[in-house]
Amino acid sequence: MGKEIVESAILSSVLVLVGLAVGFLLLKVQGE
């Protein structure tokens, strides 16, 4: 039970990090 919660938390945090990285790259590309 606890393992599933940990895995979903890790997945969501990874998705958030990926989203932030993509957004940052898009802003950087648009700024140039």
From Swiss-Prot:
GO molecular function ontology, one term from the record: electron transfer activity
A biological process from GO: photosynthesis
Claim: Thylakoid is one of the keywords in the record: yes
Topology class, membrane: Single-pass membrane protein
Entry's Gene Ontology cellular component terms: chloroplast thylakoid membrane; cytochrome b6f complex
Transmembrane segments: 9-29
Subcellular location: Plastid, Chloroplast thylakoid membrane
Keywords from the named record: Chloroplast, Electron transport, Membrane, Photosynthesis, Plastid, Thylakoid, Transmembrane, Transmembrane helix, Transport
InterPro entries: PetM_cyt_b6/f_cplx_su7 (IPR012595)
Family named by the database record: Belongs to the PetM family.
Function statement: Component of the cytochrome b6-f complex, which mediates electron transfer between photosystem II (PSII) and photosystem I (PSI), cyclic electron flow around PSI, and state transitions.
Assembly and oligomerization: The 4 large subunits of the cytochrome b6-f complex are cytochrome b6, subunit IV (17 kDa polypeptide, PetD), cytochrome f and the Rieske protein, while the 4 small subunits are PetG, PetL, PetM and PetN. The complex functions as a dimer.
Protein name, entry field: Cytochrome b6-f complex subunit 7
